[in-house]
Structures are given as C-alpha cells and as structure tokens.
C-alpha cells in the first residue's frame, strides 16, 4: 500500500471514530442535561426547605442570644448579684445562648419590648406595668415574684410645707407613669377623696424626677431605692411611703408564645433565679458588697435598705390577692380600660 492510501485509510478510520464519538456525545447530552436539571431542582427544593425552616425560627434561635432586662433600682440585689456572678451566662451558655442585658428600666418600655420580641425575659417589672400591658391585650405572663417592698417606694417634697394629700392640690408631682410609684400616688390621693386631676402629674423617670425636685421645677417627686435614700439623707421631706397604699409587687415576666416555643429556657431562667437567691443567702456580705459597688452606696446604707425587701420568688396566694387589689384599683381609677384576670397572668410552668 502506498503512503497516500495509508493516509487515506487512517483519515477514514479517524472519521469513523469521530463520528461514533459525536454520536455518543449527542446521545449522552440529554441524559447529562436531565441529571443536571434534576440536581438543580433538588438543590432548589432543599434550599427552599432550609429557608422555610429558618423563617419559622424565632429571633432567639437565629441569633443564639437571649435579651434580659437589667434594672438596679430601687434596690434590686438579685439582678446585681446575678450580673456580678454571671449566673445567667453559666445557665444559658451550655444551652448555646449568649445573654444580652437591656437597659430599659421603665415598665411601659419593658412591656413594649417584650411584646415586640426584642426582649425575652423581664427580670424585675412592676405588677402594675404587667396589668396595664395585659389590659391592652399584650401577650405577657408572670413567671415568678421578684420582690415585695412597699416601704421602699416614697413620695418626697422639698420640705414639710407638703404634709398631706390636700397640700398637693394644684402642685406639680413628677414620677414614672404606669408604675408602682404611680399607683402609690393615685392611691394616696384617692384616700383623701382626690384624683390625679387635682394635681399636675409630670411623667418622667426616677433620676429626672429627683433632679426636678432638687432643682425646684416640681413640688414633689416619686422616688425609690438609692435615690430615695440619698434624698432622705439630704433632708428632703417624706410625704408618704407605699405601706398601706400598694404592695409594691415586682415580678419576672415573659410571653406565653415564648414559653410555648421554648419551655426549657423559661425553666432555665427560674433555675437561675433560684441560684441567685441561694448565692445571696450563702454569702450575704458579698451580696451587700456587690450592691454597694453597683449603686454607689455605702455598705451600711445597703444593709439599712436591704431589710425593706422580700425577695422570695414563690408566687403565694397573698401575692395574687395583692395584684387583684391593684388591678381593681387601676380599673376603678381609670388607669386601665379593660379588666384583667390576674390569675390568668400566672404562667403554669410544667
């Protein structure tokens, strides 16, 4: 065979092989395309499932963070000891959650943040604020008692020119609205046959109310905790305290929705609260020292005020009765428009 014929044969063979390869490629292409499309569809379905699952998670699950209120006033020793000992972190950390502290201190701010989901636990909120929130159809439930301290809440005047409720007529009185202090004021006026309309109530937080009274821009101020202690030492006149006017019940709270989604976290919170109280009992001196440091008070002052507080976390029948009395008072005085069944606010933690 000549070289030309050999070359032709080779080319023919290559052509045949190439043709077979092309045919094979053509026959394989639809199968590969179908497999790729199927894989893409499966991936899309999986991503859709993941997105749906992610959207169904609460903010807490996505962030791995629990937001808890931190309120030092009036003299919230448990909150101070908890932060000092990092007890929430020790309880929630192993469960995969970080703890973030909120600096919202007024009742209305706290209950609104709970309703919006920005905060999961209210660790010290007045029963007055809880009842007010529930009256407005908010989802809020009481987990435990934080404290009882009627004598720690006080109404101050600059001097003894204001000694009675009648002396307040037409006067400017400053204090936090929708709180235990507010309840104290309205109850005090009511006992004298007066209402809030007989005075000029100026809603503001405790620090601002203290400054307003000290500066002379108001005639009286509703104060509690270290602020009240210091004002008394500075010679300001105590018109009345909360004894006989309010039980000054402070509670811990969450939402029913959060409990239904995370019962284990609510139980963990209560475990942590009990641990805090045990720490306080085990080392009273350390609790006093931490509180003095956090509030700027002398340890002797903390000791003097400590006795005004009952931090037993158990919800007793007397607590429910006290809150029912508060609810009726708020309803009778127009502080709330819709009645609230206090017993239904107690979270049944199983």
Task: Please give the residue ranges for each predicted region.
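Conserved small/polar residues in nucleotide/adenosyl-binding loops
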Residues: 1-6
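Bacterial lipoprotein signal-peptidase II cleavage site
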Residues: 17-41, 45-49
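Extracytoplasmic "Venus flytrap"
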Residues: 60-61, 65-84
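Secondary-structure end/capping motifs
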Residues: 73, 261-335
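Pocket-flanking alpha-helical
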Residues: 76-82, 102-139, 151-165, 183, ...
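Ligand-binding cleft/hinge of the Venus flytrap
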Residues: 81-97, 182-200, 232-233, 289
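Pocket-lining segment of extracytoplasmic ligand-binding domains
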Residues: 128, 200-292
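Flexible hinge/capping segments at coil-to-helix
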Residues: 157-172, 260-264
């Amino acid at each position: 065979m000549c070289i030309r014929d050999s070359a032709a044969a080779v080319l023919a063979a290559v052509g045949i092989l190439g043709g077979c390869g092309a045919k094979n490629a053509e026959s394989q292409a639809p199968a590969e395309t179908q497999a790729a499309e199927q894989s893409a569809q499966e991936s899309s379905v999986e991503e859709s499932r993941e997105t749906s699952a992610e959207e169904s998670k609460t903010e807490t699950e996505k962030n791995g963070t629990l937001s808890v209120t931190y309120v030092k006033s009036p003299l919230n020793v448990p909150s101070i000891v908890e932060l000092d000992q990092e007890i929430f972190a020790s309880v929630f950390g192993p469960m995969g959650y970080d703890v973030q502290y909120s600096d919202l201190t007024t009742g209305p701010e706290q209950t609104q943040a709970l309703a919006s989901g920005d905060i999961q636990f209210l660790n010290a909120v007045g029963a007055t604020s809880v009842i007010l929130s529930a009256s407005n159809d908010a989802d809020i439930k009481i987990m435990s008692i934080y404290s009882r301290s009627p004598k720690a809440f006080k109404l101050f005047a600059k001097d003894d020119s204001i000694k009675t409720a009648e002396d307040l007529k037409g006067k400017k009185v400053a204090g936090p609205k929708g709180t235990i202090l507010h309840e104290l004021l309205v109850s005090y006026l009511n006992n004298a046959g007066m209402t809030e309309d007989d005075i000029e109530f100026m809603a503001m937080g405790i620090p601002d109310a203290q400054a307003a009274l000290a500066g002379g821009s108001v005639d009286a101020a509703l104060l509690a905790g270290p602020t009240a202690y210091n004002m008394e030492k500075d010679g300001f006149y105590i018109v009345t305290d909360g004894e006989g006017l309010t039980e000054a019940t402070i509670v811990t709270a969450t939402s029913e929705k959060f409990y239904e989604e995370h019962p284990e976290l609510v139980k963990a919170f209560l475990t942590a609260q009990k641990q805090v109280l045990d720490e306080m009992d085990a080392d009273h001196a350390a609790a006093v020292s931490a509180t003095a440091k956090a509030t700027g008070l002398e340890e002797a002052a903390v000791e003097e005020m400590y006795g005004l507080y009952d931090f037993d976390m158990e919800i007793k029948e007397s607590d429910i009765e006290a809150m029912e009395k508060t609810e009726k008072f708020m309803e009778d005085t127009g502080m709330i428009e819709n009645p609230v069944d206090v017993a239904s606010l107690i979270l049944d933690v199983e």
